[in-house]
From Swiss-Prot:
Mg(2+) 2 binds at E297, N299. The gene is ddl. Cell wall formation. Pathway: Cell wall biogenesis; peptidoglycan biosynthesis. ATP binds at residues 154-209. HAMAP family: Dala_Dala_lig. This is D-alanine--D-alanine ligase. PANTHER family: D-ALANINE--D-ALANINE LIGASE, D-ALANINE--D-ALANINE LIGASE A.
Length: 337
């Protein structure tokens, strides 16, 4: 049986470029455990240039092959691609649109679902439409005096707010604000990351995460895990990825009742199915002291770094990551043929 030529595409050039490379390491190691795949790792930089791990400049062509700048190298046909890219252009749905155009099968959510989840405003509209509770918010489409006034009014009403660039991940362009004097500066910074900004009420709550993925034709939601920050603030980019981070993770959140856990999992599956996600996601919730459950956000290509929750929760649920990848990829290619 011939091997599947699998393109492992990573990087992307966004603020999460280096995190993508860390996740790609995990995918590469997992795929190497199977004899089904011939893997070519290619990094995409912020200028749209492709380069193999061996340092060869190349490009992905409309003929679904990797063509090398060194024309003495034979083009490498691509059967399947894993776009291991956090942020733009992976989780935004942009690169998936290209794969659809050239009819190249790929791992993960499709373009529209990715885009809907990555934009925090669109995502919250979907959550509400599906009847899933989420944090109170307003959204802004330009930085002007009216936006500053609206944000200050929200701060006065809610006491504390988060100002977030609507289309960024890993807490990039995200600011906690308690002082009205800082509103204008924070808004200016947030609009520097995205054309739309969302302002949310600060929720004092536990941060719970659920891995939701497809396995043998079923949508699986794990029991919630938990992020615990030593700083007792929100989970910043540095808290997530800095080597000296004091944040810790519990693969199974402690002191969560079976009833609450099942409700969170039900909401997670409802979001996954309702927003037509595919293959994998990590869905994050807040749980308040009054046991109020609020959907926070959906990650359509969750991190797979040494500290990331998704692979740990999948493994804790009894599923092997390599076997999971094999099932998804083979099932998809079989259906295509």
């Amino acid at each position: 049986m011939s091997k599947i030529n699998l393109l492992l595409l990573c990087g992307g050039g966004s603020a999460e470029h280096d995190i993508s490379l860390m996740s790609a390491n995990y995918f590469e190691t997992s795929l190497a455990k199977s004899e089904q795949f011939s893997v070519l790792r290619v990094e995409l930089d912020k200028f749209g240039q492709y380069r193999t791990a061996a340092g060869d400049d190349c490009e992905l062509t409309n003929s679904r092959e990797i063509r090398f700048r060194d024309e003495s190298k034979t083009p490498w046909p691509v059967d399947y691609v894993i776009p291991c890219i956090h942020g733009y252009p992976g989780e935004t749905g942009d690169i998936q649109s290209y794969f659809n155009l050239i009819q190249l099968p790929y791992f993960g959510c499709e373009s529209e679902a990715s885009s809907n989840c990555f934009n925090k405003i669109t995502a919250k509209m979907w959550f509400s439409a599906l009847g899933i509770p989420n944090t109170p918010y307003i959204f802004l489409n330009q930085f002007d005096d009216a936006a500053i006034e609206q944000t200050q009014a929200a701060l006065a009403q809610w006491g504390s707010i988060f100002v977030k660039a609507a289309s960024q991940g890993s807490s990039v362009g995200c600011y906690k604000v308690d002082d009205s004097a800082k509103v204008a500066g924070v808004l200016k910074d947030a609009f520097g990351y995205a054309p739309y900004v969302i302002v949310e009420k600060t929720i004092k709550a536990r941060e719970l995460e659920v891995a939701v993925y497809e396995y043998n034709g079923e949508v699986v939601a794990t029991v919630p895990g938990e992020i615990i920050c030593d700083t007792n603030t929100f989970y910043t980019f540095d808290e997530k990825y800095a080597k000296n981070s004091k944040a810790r993770t519990d693969v199974v959140a402690q002191h969560v009742s079976a009833e609450i856990s099942e409700q969170i999992r039900a909401y997670a599956i409802k979001a996954f199915k309702g927003m037509k996600l595919r293959h994998l996601s990590r869905i994050d919730f807040f749980l308040t002291a009054d046991n109020e459950i609020l959907l926070n956000e959906i990650n359509t290509f969750p991190g797979s770094t040494p500290i990331s929750m998704f692979p740990k929760m999948l493994q804790n649920h009894g599923h092997d990551f390599t076997e999971y990848l094999s099932l998804v990829i083979n099932g998809q290619l079989t259906a295509k043929s």
